[in-house]
Regions:
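Flexible, low-complexity junctional segments that flank or bridge functional domains
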Residues: 1-126, 131-139, 197, 203, ...
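C-terminal "post-core" interaction segments
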Residues: 100-259
Length: 259
């Protein structure tokens, strides 16, 4: 009950006999079976370890980024897929629904595929004392662009299940002129927990920093990142075999290319 009061999935208490963590996350409206059947003609391909899947919708590359957890290898593979699609697609849809985070190194590895200038991606400050406002000075984090970046329209789909490193990914890309974010607010949890052993041998993990928007320096903890357009899947949409957020994303890219 003590852990649940904090409503933060980055806080974990581990004992030899149990693990205590906040699990009452927001439910995602992502439906992989619906998308695979009705949008990808059952041609959805899964990457290594299942952290991403992808396919073509018309001439748009669709990527579901399920997680940023694990080793770098699958994300290097995905980066190569994105780079190879630069001249063969009219746009990319990056679906982050269900992505609860993972490694910001992996998130930034993919983000680099889209930036063409040296950019600030976030401000961070670390907890450094017991007082309520005991934090370090703000530290700027930047990303260096790749030589060849994806230049066509990009739509990112978010909902309340998007947390942590996945929010880092959104923070980095949403400032780009060719990137549009649609869906719902993200979950609002930056985390970066540190691990400590208690005197009784139990292990506790607690968040140790705050992350702020790279442009406004606004905090989003407990609030989330607002999309450019708020759009939610309805029960009727699912019954009809429609993903209205994905439909919007497809039409958005097609309309840009028609103009």
């Amino acid at each position: 009950q003590m852990i649940y009061q904090l409503r933060d999935g980055h806080i974990v208490l581990e004992s030899p006999f149990n693990r205590y963590q906040y699990y009452d996350w927001y439910q995602s409206d992502y439906n992989s079976n619906l998308i695979n059947a009705n949008y990808l003609n059952y041609q959805l391909q899964e990457g290594q370890t299942g952290v991403y899947s992808y396919g073509r919708i018309q001439d748009i590359l669709y990527v579901h980024l399920a997680s940023f957890k694990g080793q770098k290898k699958p994300f290097i593979e995905l980066a190569q897929i994105i780079e190879a699609s630069n001249n063969t697609t009219s746009g990319i849809i990056l679906d982050l629904r269900t992505n609860g985070g993972g490694s910001d190194v992996n998130a930034h590895l993919i983000a680099k595929e889209f930036i063409n200038n040296f950019i600030r991606i976030r401000w961070i400050r670390y907890r450094n004392g017991p007082d309520h406002y005991a934090y370090s000075r703000w530290i700027s984090n930047e990303l260096t662009p790749k030589q060849h970046n994806y230049k066509r329209p990009v739509v990112i789909i978010t909902d309340r299940s998007v947390f942590s490193a996945a929010e880092d990914f959104v923070l980095a890309l949403r400032q780009l002129p060719n990137v549009f974010v649609v869906g719902q607010f993200t979950g609002g949890g930056s985390g970066n927990p540190m691990t400590r052993e208690l005197p009784n041998g139990w292990i506790i993990k607690v968040p140790r920093w705050q992350v702020a928007d790279p442009l406004t320096k606004e905090l989003y903890e407990g609030i989330g990142l607002e999309p450019d357009v708020i759009l939610m899947q309805r029960t009727l949409d699912t019954t009809l075999g429609i993903d209205r957020v994905l439909d919007f994303s497809i039409n958005y890219i097609n309309n840009l290319n028609d103009n």
